[in-house]
Amino acid sequence: MNRPQGEPAKALRLPAALLYAEPLPEDLVEVGYVGAAYGIRGWIKVQPHADDASALLHARRWWLLSPPQAGLVAADAARSQPVCVKIAQSREHSGTVVAQAAGVADRNLAEALRGRRVWIRRADFPAPDEDEFYWVDLIGCNVSNEQGELLGEVSGLIDNGAHQILQVAFVQPDGKAGERLIPFVDAFLREVDTAGKRIVVDWGLDY
C-alpha cells in the first residue's frame, strides 16, 4: 500500500532481542561504522576505521551505538538505544567488512542499523605480533627520553602513509598546550611498555 503524500515514513522498530539494556563494557573501542546493508538476507557492510580489520573479524560480539546527535528528541530515543549483536560470520570485502549478525534477518533490519558506530571490547582484539601495538594501547602513555626527561603524554597518532607518528601533548612554560610529533619507528624508539603506560624515545626536549 502506498503511503499518503506528505505522511512521514515510520521508523522500523528494532527487535527487543537486539537491544542492550545493561551497562556498557568499560573497554569498548570504536572500530568502524555500518555503511549499508549488504544483500537481502540481513548482512551489514562496515567501514573500518583502520586498514587492518583483524579486530573486527576476530570479535564475535559487536556493540552498535548511534553517533551523538544535537537536539535528540524523545521520538529518537528508541533508535539511540545500544544494540548488541552476535556475529555468525564475517569477511573482508573491497576495503570493508561484511557480516551476518544473529537476529538481523532481512535487508530492512540491516538498513535500520546504517550509520551506527561499531564498538568491540579491547579484550576481544587478537593478540598483536611481537613488536606490534594497537593504537588504543598507546594513547595515554607517558613519553620520556633516555635522559629521563618527560616529553609529554600520547594524545593520538597520525598515519602519514609511510609510518605512524605519535602526537605527544605537553604543557609549555607559559602554560599553553604544546604538541610534539615523534615518528613511531625503530630509529627513535627505545622501549614501549603498554602495561606500564610508558614509552622511551631518543628525542630531545628542544627538537
From Swiss-Prot:
Cross-referenced Pfam families: PRC_RimM, RimM
Its domain of life reads Bacteria
> Does rRNA processing count among this protein's keywords?
yes
Q: Specify where it is mainly localized.
A: cytoplasm
The Gene Ontology terms for molecular function here are: ribosome binding
What UniProt keywords are attached to this protein's entry? Chaperone, Cytoplasm, Ribosome biogenesis, rRNA processing
Q: List GO terms (cellular component aspect).
A: cytoplasm; ribosome
What family is this?
Belongs to the RimM family.
What is the stated purpose of this protein?
Answer: An accessory protein needed during the final step in the assembly of 30S ribosomal subunit, possibly for assembly of the head region. Essential for efficient processing of 16S rRNA. May be needed both before and after RbfA during the maturation of 16S rRNA. It has affinity for free ribosomal 30S subunits but not for 70S ribosomes.
The protein depicted here goes by the name Ribosome maturation factor RimM
Q: What is the lineage of its organism?
A: Bacteria, Pseudomonadati, Pseudomonadota, Betaproteobacteria, Burkholderiales
